[in-house]
């Protein structure tokens, strides 16, 4: 057997006590002696298990309200002692070998996530003895097994049963890696939290408020998938996800069928899903190369899909389709019978819809679960030698936020379309222009270096598909620096505009809208997307 080590003595000390009684009982049934500390020891004893308190084993009591429990040579000597090398000195000092350590750490992240958390609470939830034992056991994985995740209890027991109560080196090494990842993430959380207590850079006042952004920033992501290649075929790639993410997302979605998701599939699906989350009504978003090419609302998702597809059938070919309602069979049939699609994602997929999509085996079908709003957090962009870190763009406007700046007031329908259009524009690459009518996009101008050309492209798109622009509204993700964008929109038939405002030439732009009889509202909020 491959460098197997028998498990005869285990030290159990956990904050997350999920499954620990069952694990301890199973170990004891296999003849393993149990050592434990504090609350874990009491829990095991109350469950009728024979357990030795670490303080009884070391002859040294827990002290300082539990701050010092396991920091003792008889504990760490038992973990770090090299079998067949340190045996004599261990015997000389009465140190018993500890073969398995099951430890997880004080709930620091949960503590500091509480908005009422005081600095003292955070400090008392910094684990000292736990990480020390974890690192000691992981360092000595040649002889010792470390378990930091309750999900591994079953794995350990199964291998013990298969190997006469022993564990292989491969398993010990794998668990040691998990342990180092665990302590790295834990220390990163602590550094991130205390890093926000440093005075904001550039502010000399020592009493300045805490910074939202720590002095150093630590992230930990877990590899979910190796990919055939990245954005291009000559680039290697993998997909990493955050641990314990609760928000419905492409990262947490379950793939029901189809080929493995590609790098570009994941990026585009994220864009489509985040856009469709903006809407309360049944909605469909079709994305191509990270830009919405068709977005619409409907009485149901079939109507929403048909209308979104109508915006730009050419670009929808090979696109990503996202819904904010259950995917039903009728909608699935409409999609697969009409177009080539890379990915379909919805909160739920009916059994009937699964059967329909199964006829197209290569279509990637994802189920992401329902969502309750969007979580706050950071957006990160990599630049050469650095990271740009900012809040997620959660900004949105309501009717009460709109400021009418023209002589003509928007109609009730125009106001409804303006808010729809504004939500879509948030997800279009800058410079972004969106034309919409009756809660349906009719033209999207994305990613142009001049705003007027984005406006012209939106009009061209609508004309190419035979969509009537007259009476439509336009959203711009940033202000118009000149009146030319308004003139182009008016020529296409736009009657109402929503934009942030804030240009030195705002009055010139407003005058242009008045000349054309258009209504215009300012949001005082920009939605650049690069």
Curated annotation (Swiss-Prot):
Domain MGS-like, first and last residues per copy: 1-148
GO CC term (a single one): cytosol
Domain of life of the source: Bacteria
Entry keyword annotation includes Hydrolase: yes
Keywords linked to the UniProt accession: Hydrolase, Multifunctional enzyme, Purine biosynthesis, Transferase
EC number annotated for this UniProt entry: 2.1.2.3, 3.5.4.10
Pathway linked to the protein: Purine metabolism; IMP biosynthesis via de novo pathway; 5-formamido-1-(5-phospho-D-ribosyl)imidazole-4-carboxamide from 5-amino-1-(5-phospho-D-ribosyl)imidazole-4-carboxamide (10-formyl THF route): step 1/1; Purine metabolism; IMP biosynthesis via de novo pathway; IMP from 5-formamido-1-(5-phospho-D-ribosyl)imidazole-4-carboxamide: step 1/1
GO-annotated biological processes: 'de novo' IMP biosynthetic process
GO molecular function, one term: IMP cyclohydrolase activity
Reactions that this protein is recorded to catalyse: (6R)-10-formyltetrahydrofolate + 5-amino-1-(5-phospho-beta-D-ribosyl)imidazole-4-carboxamide = 5-formamido-1-(5-phospho-D-ribosyl)imidazole-4-carboxamide + (6S)-5,6,7,8-tetrahydrofolate; IMP + H2O = 5-formamido-1-(5-phospho-D-ribosyl)imidazole-4-carboxamide
Family per record: Belongs to the PurH family.
Matching HAMAP family: PurH
Description of its domains: The IMP cyclohydrolase activity resides in the N-terminal region.
NCBIfam families tied to this protein: PRK00881.1, purH
UniProt-recorded name of the protein: Bifunctional purine biosynthesis protein PurH
Species this chain originates from: Tolumonas auensis (strain DSM 9187 / NBRC 110442 / TA 4)
Lineage of source species: Bacteria, Pseudomonadati, Pseudomonadota, Gammaproteobacteria, Aeromonadales
């Amino acid at each position: 057997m491959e460098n197997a080590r028998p498990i005869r003595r285990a030290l159990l000390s956990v904050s997350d006590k999920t499954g620990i009684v069952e694990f301890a009982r199973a170990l004891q049934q296999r003849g393993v002696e149990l050592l434990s500390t504090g609350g874990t020891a009491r829990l095991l004893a109350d469950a009728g298990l024979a357990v030795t308190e670490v303080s009884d084993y070391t002859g040294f009591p827990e002290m300082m309200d539990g701050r010092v429990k396991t920091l003792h040579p008889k504990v760490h000597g038992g973990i770090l002692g090299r079998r067949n090398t340190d045996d004599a000195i261990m015997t000389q000092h009465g140190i018993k070998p500890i073969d398995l350590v099951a430890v997880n750490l004080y709930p620091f992240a949960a503590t500091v996530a509480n908005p009422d958390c005081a600095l003292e609470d955070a400090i008392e939830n910094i684990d000292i003895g736990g990480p020390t034992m974890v690192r000691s056991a992981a360092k000595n994985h040649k002889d010792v097994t470390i378990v930091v995740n309750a999900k591994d209890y079953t794995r350990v027991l199964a291998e013990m049963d298969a190997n006469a109560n022993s564990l292989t080196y491969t398993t010990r090494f794998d668990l040691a890696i998990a342990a180092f990842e665990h302590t790295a993430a834990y220390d990163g959380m602590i550094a991130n939290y205390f890093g926000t207590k440093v005075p904001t850079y550039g502010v000399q006042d020592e009493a300045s408020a805490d910074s939202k952004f720590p002095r150093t920033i630590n992230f930990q992501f877990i590899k979910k998938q190796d990919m055939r290649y990245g954005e291009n075929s000559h680039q290697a790639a993998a997909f990493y996800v955050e641990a314990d993410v609760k928000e419905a997302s492409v990262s947490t979605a379950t793939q029901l069928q189809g080929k493995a998701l590609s790098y570009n599939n994941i990026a585009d699906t994220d864009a489509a899903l985040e856009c469709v989350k903006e809407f309360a009504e049944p909605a469909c978003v079709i994305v191509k190369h990270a830009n919405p090419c068709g977005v619409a609302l409907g009485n149901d998702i079939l109507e929403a899909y048909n209308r979104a597809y109508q915006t730009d059938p050419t670009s929808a070919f090979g696109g990503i389709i996202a819904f904010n309602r259950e995917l039903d069979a009728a909608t699935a049939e409409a999609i697969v019978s009409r177009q080539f699609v890379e990915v379909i994602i919805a909160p739920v997929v009916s059994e009937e819809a699964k059967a329909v999509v199964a006829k197209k085996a290569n279509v990637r079908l994802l189920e992401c679960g329902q969502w309750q709003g969007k979580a706050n957090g950071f957006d990160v962009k990599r630049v050469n030698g650095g990271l740009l870190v900012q809040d997620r763009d959660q900004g949105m406007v309501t009717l009460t936020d709109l400021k009418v700046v023209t002589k003509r007031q928007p109609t009730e329908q125009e106001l409804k379309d303006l808010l729809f259009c504004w939500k879509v524009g948030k997800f279009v690459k800058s410079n972004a222009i969106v034309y919409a009518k009756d809660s349906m996009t009719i033209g999207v101008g994305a990613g142009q270096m001049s705003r007027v050309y984005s406006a012209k492209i939106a009009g061209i798109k609508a004309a190419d598909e035979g969509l009537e622009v007259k009476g439509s509204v336009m959203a711009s993700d940033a202000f118009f620096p000149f009146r030319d964008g308004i003139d182009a929109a008016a020529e296409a038939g736009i009657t109402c505009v929503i934009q942030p405002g804030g240009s030195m030439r705002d009055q010139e732009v407003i005058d242009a809208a008045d000349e054309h009889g258009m209504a215009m509202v300012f949001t005082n909020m920009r939605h650049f997307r690069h």
